[in-house]
């Protein structure tokens, strides 16, 4: 599905309603202040949240639900502002904070959350390591997840969850997700996350050996720089394949 820039709430609702139940519908994790005719302007990103993706890669939703509830104990104890969603195959947790202009600050806070979860449940957990990408997408609430299905082959919906839902087991969540869940949208908690200042990047001594390559494909310099990182974004990978 092609991306579309919408600037008004009504246009957004019309687009989502037209595509829902036909295809997967996504929107950006982060908001942007400015847009060109066909795309967002990356430099105008509003960095005011961290997106935590608990992904059931092996269809182990019980594991993902366990991890969400562990992290939510910390969130509720600190009264962080949050929203929580079941995506159809995992869970999306947003923690909202004071705006920062350095994505590394968000990544530093994420590492604190990750260390907390590892301390509680161990290294075998469902929290996705990819965080802090301004191009990251997330599923639109109350749209169908075409990659999911119940025992009868019916897909689940991405639905909002509230604090009271944390007492349910995963079967209770799946029952809720069998249809859209139209409840008033509101954030839980009252305290904004204060993203810690990331430590300065220090030079590392020594040399890095570059592996020999066989042949050379013509590639735009900007695309080469985008994919030659430790964890390329989804968009850069897609551009590489299409190139």
Task: Indicate residue ranges for each PLM-predicted region.
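Extended hydrophobic/Leu-rich segments
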Residues: 7, 12-16, 35, 170-173, ...
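Generic recognition of flexible, low-complexity loop/linker segments
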Residues: 39-40, 81, 126-127, 226-231, ...
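Short, conserved alpha-helical segments within structured domains
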Residues: 87-91, 132-136, 237
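Flexible helix-coil linker/hinge segments at domain or subdomain boundaries
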Residues: 80, 98-157, 163-185
């Amino acid at each position: 599905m092609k991306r579309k820039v919408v600037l008004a709430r009504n246009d957004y609702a019309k687009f989502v309603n037209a595509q829902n139940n036909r295809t997967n519908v996504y929107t950006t994790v982060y908001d942007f202040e400015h847009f060109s005719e066909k795309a967002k302007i990356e430099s105008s990103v509003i960095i005011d949240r961290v997106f935590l993706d608990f992904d059931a890669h092996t269809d182990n939703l019980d594991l993902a639900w366990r991890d969400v509830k562990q992290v939510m104990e910390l969130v509720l104890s600190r009264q962080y502002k949050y929203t929580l969603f079941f995506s159809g195959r995992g869970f999306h947790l947003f923690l909202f904070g004071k705006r920062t202009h350095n994505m590394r600050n968000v990544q530093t806070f994420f590492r604190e959350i990750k260390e907390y979860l590892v301390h509680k449940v161990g290294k075998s957990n469902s929290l996705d390591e990819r965080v802090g990408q301004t191009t990251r997408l997330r599923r639109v609430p109350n749209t169908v997840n075409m990659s999911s299905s119940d025992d009868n082959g019916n897909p689940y919906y991405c639905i909002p969850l509230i604090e009271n839902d944390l007492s349910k087991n995963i079967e209770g969540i799946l029952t809720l997700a069998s249809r859209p869940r139209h409840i008033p949208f509101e954030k839980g908690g009252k305290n904004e996350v204060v993203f810690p200042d990331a430590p300065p990047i220090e030079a590392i001594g020594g040399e890095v050996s570059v592996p020999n390559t066989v042949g050379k494909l013509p590639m735009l310099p900007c695309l080469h720089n985008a994919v030659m990182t430790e964890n390329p974004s989804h968009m850069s990978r897609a551009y590489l394949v299409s190139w």
